[in-house]
Amino acid sequence: MKRVKGAFDERAAALDGLLGVGRSFDMIGRTLRIGGRRARLWVVNGYADDTVLERAISAWLPIPSLEDVGTLQAFADRYVSVCDAAVETDRLKAVTAVFAGKTLLVIDGFSGGVVLDAKQFPLRSVEEPDTSKVLRGSHDGFGESVMKNAALLRRRIRDSQLTLESLQVGTRSRTDVVLCYMENRVDRKLLDQLRKKLEAMDVGSIAMSQESVAEAIAPPQWWNPFPKTRYTERPDVAAASVLEGDILLMIDNTPAVMLLPCSLFRFLEEVNDYYFPPLVGTYLRIVRVIVLFLTLFVTPLWYLLVKSPDTLHESLHFLLIEDEYYVPLILQLLLVEFIIDVLKLASLNTPDVLSNSFSMLGALILGDFAVQARWLVPEVLVYMAFVAIANYAQHSYEMGYAVKLCRMALLLLIWLFDWWGFIGGILGTLALIASTRPLIGKGYLYPFIPFNGKDLWALLHHRPIDRNNS
């Protein structure tokens, strides 16, 4: 093959410039001599598996000549032993592959380059998610590598119908995004709809991973606090969802996997329901539904009844406040709502060695000291303590804050308009839920609207596996 003088130097210099060799300390560009020809290899230091690269280079250096090798593909077939290796002629794709952790090899006299997958990301070990623990079942969890997450899913679903479709999102970050679904179970219309939304994303980066993707493809409803997607860090939950026909959205650099489509009733499900007998699982689900309603209505209803003591029946007089207080009740309730969030934020930044002391200090400030100073009455602390604990009975952090904002709005409406405010707040909450538009799917209130009795019954109770295992 005839080689153009200076062509290799120009290609190498251009790739050095695009990859930042000499500008970024972690970008390595090494010149080799393979079969009597000049070659250059690019790799990001910290990504590469040194053992794999050393083995590959040791096999290339003794090659006496490449005169009998007609194409770069023939070279890759004969001398490249790495399993995941391909010839790439598109310069931009080759550069992107290097930034993603792969190794690029360019040889004088051949067009394009060989892209080798010899990467080894710095990863934490597989461990159970802190926010989704189970008494029984597997104790592993997704990590920050989409390849590792795909392997955890493949381990549970050994079926040729399982499809993992790779996309890249972000003009600068070029983050790997994987659509995961079962070919014979997925709704093709919803799949095409989601794929088009991802391909139409025009963003520079998705540094915040799944939240950035959700915001980019979600309908514009910034004023609506209800979550439009579910997340999980558990491979067993992801596997069960995809087998039911759901679509998983895996995003590199985050352990959270998006479960689509999403509806309000899907938040009633929790992994522990399926690791207990059907009757126990159904009971736990019913408890979760009741607690969700109590979380929304306990403090507004109590405040409404206490605000109008003349209309209170004698059997409910125990709800009235007998102690003297200086701060209005509405301010007490909103103040405790605010302080609970402050404690949550502070606990995230508190070192483990100080967490016990921090908990004791927070309990004293919110408890005995506040009551003695007559800032708060004991009844407010009791009801707000129940609300704070009950908020964790359902697993979605986003749904918890949606309920919290609706509860605070109810309190303000009751303060302004009494019973009419309570009725208006309930109607407004229902209207807000009904107007929520999910990323994809039949509707946020499905299977209630549009009604599907079979699916609704399946969501409200734990159905045992039948003899057909379906």
Which residues does each PLM region occupy?
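Transmembrane alpha-helical segments that form the functional core of multipass membrane systems
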Residues: 249, 256, 262-410
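Membrane-embedded alpha-helical signal segments
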Residues: 1-301, 305-314, 318-320, 433-470
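Hydrophobic alpha-helical transmembrane segments of membrane transport and translocation systems
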Residues: 378-380, 384-470
